[in-house]
Amino acid sequence: MHGTSAPALNVEQGVNLRTLNAFGLPAAAATLVRIDSEATLRRVIDHPELGRAPKFVLGGGSNIVFTRDPQAVVLKVEVMGRRLVQERPDAWIVEAGGGENWHDTVAWTLAQGWPGLENLALIPGSVGAAPVQNIGAY
C-alpha cells in the first residue's frame, strides 16, 4: 500500500530557553515542539504522550519571566506568513501567522501602503500574543 504520511514531529529535548525570552533568563524545556502550522498543533494534541502532557505556549518571549523550568511540554509558536485577505475602500483585512514579529508586521503593512497600525509600532511581541499581551493594552 502506498500513501503519504506526515513527517515525524520534531520533538526537541533539553532545550535552553535563554534565547527564547526577552530577559535572557535561564530556563530549560525538557520537551519543546516548534509549532509551524495548525496541522503540527493538531498532531501534538493527538500524540499519545504529548497530547496528555501539560502544555506551555511560548510566543516571542517578551512577557515571560522564568523563575524555574517549565513543568510542561513547551509549544513554541512559529506559524509564519502574512497576506491581504480583503481590501475595502476604508480598510484592509490582513492575516498573519502567530509567530510573526508584531513590529515587523506593522512595518510590512505600512510598506504595502495600508495605514492604521503605525501607532502600534515598536511594541515587543508576536502577532499571536497581540490580543492578550503588550499590544492588547492599546
Question: Where in the sequence are the language-model features?
Answer:
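Anion-binding (especially nucleotide phosphate/pyrophosphate-binding) glycine-rich loop
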Residues: 2-138
